[in-house]
Amino acid sequence: MAWPWRRRRWRWRRRRPRWRRWRRRRTWRRRPRRAVRRRRVRRRGRGWRRLYRRYRRRRGRRTYKKKPVLTQWQPTVRRRCFIIGYMPLIICGENLTSKNYASHADDFVKDGPFGGGMTTMQFSLRILYDEFLRFLNIWTHSNQDLDLARYHGFKLTLYRHPTVDFIVIIRNSPPFEDTELTGPNTHPGMLMLRHKKILVPSLRTRPSRRHKITVRIGPPKLFEDKWYSQTDICDVILATVYATACDLQYPFGSPLTENYCISFQVLGSAYNNLISNTLNPNEEQQDIKSAIYNNVNAYLTRITESHMANLISKAPPKQVLKSSDGSLQTDHNDTQFGGNPYNTNQFTTTTVNKIIQGAQNYLTTIKTHLQPNNSAINPNTQWHLEYHAGIYSAPFLSAGRLNPEIKGLYTDITYNPMMDKGTGNKIWCDSLTKADMKYTEGRSKYLIENLPLWAAVWGYLDYCTKTSGDAAFHYNYRVTLISPYTSPMLFNPQDPTKGFVPYSLNFGLGKMPGGKGYVPLRMRANWYPYFFHQQKVLEAIGMSGPFTYRSDEKKAVLTSRYKFKFTWGGNPVSHQVVRNPCKGTGGASASRKPRSVQVTDPKYNTPEITTHTWDIRRGWFGKRFIDRVQQQQASPELLADPPKRPRKEIKGLTEADQEAEKDSGLRLRQVQPWMSSQETQSEQESAPEEQTVEQQLRNQLHTQQLLGFQLRSLMYQVQQTHRNSFIHPLLLPRA
């Protein structure tokens, strides 16, 4: 009989699952032991050891230096407040990928797509209060009677779209300005090359993952953690968000297309000297006839019949006959063999004059039907801009030609985005009154060069509109391109400054952008290429770049949730509210209704009009407090008009700001006392003709105003520094 304590113990073993195969057991790898740097010792022989000096043992407790206690004044009342809300960072309508959503967030669109596929958005306390007025966020605590504030950062949660991918970049370091390179750097192909970016893949691109991405952003880099007045930090830019829609599954072209090259049309050389919309056609009638109307091959399009059926006469039908040697006869009207179906003998005499007269009749009819009568339309001087028979009408610029080998008044361009190196590319805007297509320093505006075309056109219209301050910019300017990376090249080696004017396919077909066939009467009287009819070309060029979203959905939205953390502080006076206990608000459930938080506009929550504990003496307001409140202006209670541009949009340098900077630099350079007489003499010699006395007085007045503004700004900064509430100027938006 074996003793039970000597029996071999049963050892537990892991068994194979009954209906599954063996799987390797996951073992957590232990972190390697940190190597200890040992002291190098001297080896001695046996029987020898190192002698140590004997020290007397100290009695008592060791004393340490006292740490200095740094104290900072804190307000009596401190309340933590979270501002939580939801906001669409991007709402991208169909075929609006290259537009800036932040610039069009407050638009009123009756019909058609809305928004844009990119955004450059900023956050500030004023913007958060504006969102509160729109019932888009909540404040967990009121800021009423608490005039101080501290900012601690925010959390941004991005929710993934089912089918559309996005790229987001968040910045909290200045400068916070929109420049000519902001749009190109927001292109998906450029953002994918950035180191610090946030990819928001769609549920289709990356399934079985969390449906949201959370990011923690701290205060701005130049922002000090201390108490500020809410008025001072009301306009401080807390963070900026740059986002764009993209395609992470098919970055280099959709699988539904044959290739990633695009084609568009540009005006031919016949329009080089006829591009101005203020051209008098009666004075330049001979040039217009010889360049446009007398060109018989220009009428060989599929739209000529619908536009000029009653203005142009056809030749009698002739057959293509073959001679005995197999050659074709030269006198025929079959366009497949280079013929012309129209009566070519009458073009220089009867037909051209009939077309011009028809254009004048159309303008007279348009002027009659416009109520009230529009005196700006003159049929005698604007007949060349008429919709049906003008020099930019569909019979001359439509892409569908009866014989593609017979060239018209335009040029077909093919663009390969993968061949674009950027060097030599130029894009700029010219006024419609400019008489040529050349780049002229001073007259040509908003130049972007040495960038790929697919990046240069990204957000270009919104940048130009923002910088110019003209809401009708797309009606007053045209876009001109230079690019040696197209086929044929949009570059003239004999004249490197000459540009080319592109136009959309719908404009060439006589349609509105988007393909609508009805053209308003006012546009029929002024039918010529400008930015409004060039947007789709720039959209197509931008969408040809890598990682670009190609408008597969009617509307794509990037939804976000933000949570800003503030601390309100102050020394308010306790208000005792006494209600009538005998008069209720109606019903037993009145106290169960949710109470709304009273939020005050941070712009007017100033220390000057806020009541503090030290403003009351023996139950009465002090004289200083009464005088201080009387000097302040009352806050407007009436509803103000909405801002001209969205507040969430990042501001840019306007033309006035750029000119002011140039003038300030020039004038400061002129008044520098350390400049040598030789430099001053050289500048005077290079200056233009002598200015008049009136111009000199105006320049001196402008210089004095500029110096006064700079001195006032300096004194304000000194005062803010003395109050320990100085804010770095780069964190403030431009006025």
UniProtKB/Swiss-Prot annotation:
Specify whether Manganese is a keyword of the entry: no
The record's keywords, sorted A to Z, are:
Capsid protein, T=1 icosahedral capsid protein, Virion
Q: What protein is this chain from?
A: Capsid protein
Q: Which family does it belong to?
A: Belongs to the anelloviridae capsid protein family.
Where does it primarily localize? virion
- Give start-end positions of Basic and acidic residues composition bias: 649-666
* Positions of the UniProt region annotated as Disordered: 577-604, 632-695
Q: What is the lineage of its organism?
A: Viruses, Viruses incertae sedis, Anelloviridae, Alphatorquevirus, Alphatorquevirus homin4
Q: Which GO terms describe its cellular component?
A: T=1 icosahedral viral capsid
- Role of this protein: Self assemble to form an icosahedral capsid.
Q: Name one Pfam family in it.
A: TT_ORF1
Biased-composition ranges, Low complexity, are: 676-685
Which cell locations does it reside in?
A: Virion
Q: Which InterPro entries match?
A: TTvirus_Unk (IPR004219)
